[in-house]
Amino acid sequence: MDLAANEISIYDKLSETVDLVRQTGHQCGMSEKAIEKFIRQLLEKNEPQRGPPQYPLLIAVYKVLLTLGLILFTAYFVIQPFSSLAPEPVLSGANSWRSLVHHIRLVSLPITKKYMPENKGVPLQGSQEDKPFPDFDPWSSYNCEQNESEPIPANCTGCAQILPLKVTLPEDTPKNFERLRPLVIKTGQPLSSAEIQSFSCQYPEVTEGFTEGFFTKWWRCFPERWFPFPYPWRRPLNRSQILRELFPVFTQLPFPKDSSLNKCFLIQPEPVVGSKMHKVHDLFTLGSGEAMLQLIPPFQCRTHCQSVAMPIESGDIGYADAAHWKVYIVARGVQPLVICDGTTLSDL
């Protein structure tokens, strides 16, 4: 109010001054044009100026808060970890029935009956009842027979040997690594929630799908890790050491010393069981949850090789030679699935 009253009084004085100048000009015989020019020059030289801001501290605090907000907003998107996995599409009715029929065929397998909860303790027919972990004979989803008259391509020799999928315990694992033979090792050592959370804090570069807010993850990992997000200037990770740190049982297994961990990712339960297959490398570990393992030969080997399917559970370690098999994991059950994807090849 004081500032407005001040400006009004200034303009009143200027108006009086202009009237006085105009009268004086007329008395001195000046022309109207000369008087207007003189008044314009007078007004330009005496234009009223606004005073300094009345609350400089408040304005300074406002600018600081605005700048800090912009910095935090930018930093959030710069260091935001990998976004969550895209939601899986719900299959149409035809595809749902196809998936249902596919799983009905899986349930009819002897190995599936062995591991289903309602069939625990029911012995298998024949000599299989004496074996705790029998070799799993492959089955073909195409019911195709091998054509012995056709030559076997070089990249199909591994799966064409019909080596059964060996299911074993860690202490019964062969001492020598057999690269061509598929293997499932039942360790019975799943990852706990605390181990998974600690691992995601320590090695955020090798985790994916663990959706958390920026400040939520920072607060959970503090003070163990000050900045639990991937950043480009960090030293390269020793992924072989990380694999054995997360799963100490690998120190007792015959896999190559340079076997390494590629990534651990979290998969939420799917609306339609079996609607999504997740491809992994030749070596993997099921940290938690239940899944179906599927080994599919390359397309050019379908006439000589057969697909393999088997249910797996938390703590299971699987291996299949990537040159002869495509390895897929299909989530099942209602619990989230944690898959740690690795490899026995040093160049990956």
Curated annotation (Swiss-Prot):
InterPro entries, sorted: BRAP (IPR038757)
UniProt keywords, alphabetically: Cytoplasm, Glycoprotein, Golgi apparatus, Membrane, Signal-anchor, Transmembrane, Transmembrane helix
GO biological process, one term: wound healing
Cellular component, GO annotation: cytoplasm; Golgi membrane; midbody; plasma membrane
Extracellular side: 80-348
TM spans (from-to): 59-79
Record PTM text: Glycosylated.
Protein name, per record: Bombesin receptor-activated protein C6orf89 homolog
Protein's organism: Mus musculus
